[in-house]
A protein has these predicted regions:
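Ala/Thr-enriched low-complexity intrinsically disordered regions
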Residues: 2, 12-18, 28
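N-terminal beta-strand/alpha-helix entry module and adjacent surface
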Residues: 6, 11, 23-124, 128-244
Length: 244
């Protein structure tokens, strides 16, 4: 199958080989068409569920000296300017740019969405940089985000804001410890929100209080990502029992 040519090369890097990613059907579940979207990408409001938020941040806390990433699952709403982020999947904490594990994980996540809930799909990407003071969106994040945006044009990238996370205990903020990036009219990734445009909000105002409780109890130890699942397939990458 020409669609998968080159995928077996375990040293291929997504930073240089984004065209080798197979074509997934993300957007067929979610149902956003670019022609209906116009140039309002930076005006979209992303409502982030507590479960999705906690899994992403706890994954980064489990690997504080590594960059980590994840996939954002969600759906459109009756309001075309609002995207609901329902869940998230922790991906990797090592070799984030290797194609074969990324390919496997995306296929499994897509199948999971189809089985779990109608209308649920892969709609965005999460990234946490290695250094807490690094708030720049790197090439790997942009390229994976680009790939998802090919099939879901309103796809956001959520970047962990290490400084906000570090100060959370002191300031008790109710805002997410994340920076939102969306594509502008020229299809370049741009930080949103500073100009009153798009924003990401927590759908449950108490989410940061719950996050602080999870940090105090070291809940991050229980988070499973795809790196761990690929090493031991008995480990649940969906983390379905994490908050039971």
């Amino acid at each position: 199958n020409a669609e998968y040519m080159g995928i077996s090369n375990s040293f291929a890097k997504i930073t240089h080989q984004t065209h080798l990613l197979p074509v997934y059907r993300f957007s067929t579940n979610v149902g956003v068409e670019e022609k209906a979207m116009g140039d309002d990408r930076l005006g979209v409001r992303y409502e982030l569920s507590q479960k999705a938020y906690l899994k992403l941040v706890l994954h980064s806390l489990k690997h504080p000296y590594s960059e980590v990433n994840g996939i954002i699952l969600g759906r459109t709403t009756s309001d075309p300017s609002v995207i609901s982020i329902v869940d998230s999947v922790p991906l990797f904490h090592s070799n984030l740019a290797l194609l074969p594990p990324l390919e496997i994980s995306l296929l499994m996540i897509e199948e999971h969405c189809a089985n779990v809930e109608e209308g649920l799909g892969i709609i965005g990407y999460f990234h946490a940089n290695e250094r807490i003071d690094d708030s720049e969106l790197g090439m790997v994040a942009k390229n994976i985000g680009d790939h998802i945006a090919r099939y879901f044009p309103l796809a956001p990238i959520l970047l962990l804001d290490g400084k906000k996370l570090d100060s959370l205990k002191r300031d008790k903020s109710i805002a997410p410890v994340l920076k939102l990036y969306a594509k502008d009219a020229y299809k370049n990734w741009k930080a949103a929100g500073s100009d009153g445009g798009g924003k990401v909000v927590l759908s449950q105002p108490a989410a940061n209080s719950i996050l602080l409780d999870c940090m105090a109890t070291e809940k991050w130890r229980e988070v499973v990502d795809f790196d761990e699942h690929l090493d031991d397939i008995t480990k649940d990458w969906s983390n379905s029992g994490l908050f039971n």
